[in-house]
Amino acid sequence: MGISKKTVVQSFALIIIISIVMSTTEANSIGAPAMREDLPKGCAPGSSAGCKMQPANPYKPGCEASQRCRGG
């Protein structure tokens, strides 16, 4: 039992339709500004000497045992 002529024609038609749709789509590429390193707002990429990023969660040391802040 072989593949019917109808199935072969439908397969070729589907391949042609898919290739037409894929060739006519417009794809926008991601430019270099989207992939550069993060800079704070208002800082130019060339003059970032005065634009230092602040840490999101600065280090805060834990408390002493004498302060009894951890149930101790």
Swiss-Prot record:
Locations listed in the record: Secreted
Source species of the chain: Arabidopsis thaliana
GO cellular component: extracellular region
GO biological process: calcium-mediated signaling; regulation of growth
Signal peptide range in chain numbering: 1-27
Function: Cell signaling peptide that may regulate plant stress, growth, and development. Mediates a rapid alkalinization of extracellular space by mediating a transient increase in the cytoplasmic Ca(2+) concentration leading to a calcium-dependent signaling events through a cell surface receptor and a concomitant activation of some intracellular mitogen-activated protein kinases.
Keyword Disulfide bond: yes
Disulphide linkage map: 43-51, 63-69
Domain of life: Eukaryota
UniProt KW keywords: Disulfide bond, Hormone, Secreted, Signal
GO terms, molecular function: hormone activity
Family under the similarity heading: Belongs to the plant rapid alkalinization factor (RALF) family.
UniProt main location, coarse: secreted
Name of the protein: Protein RALF-like 36
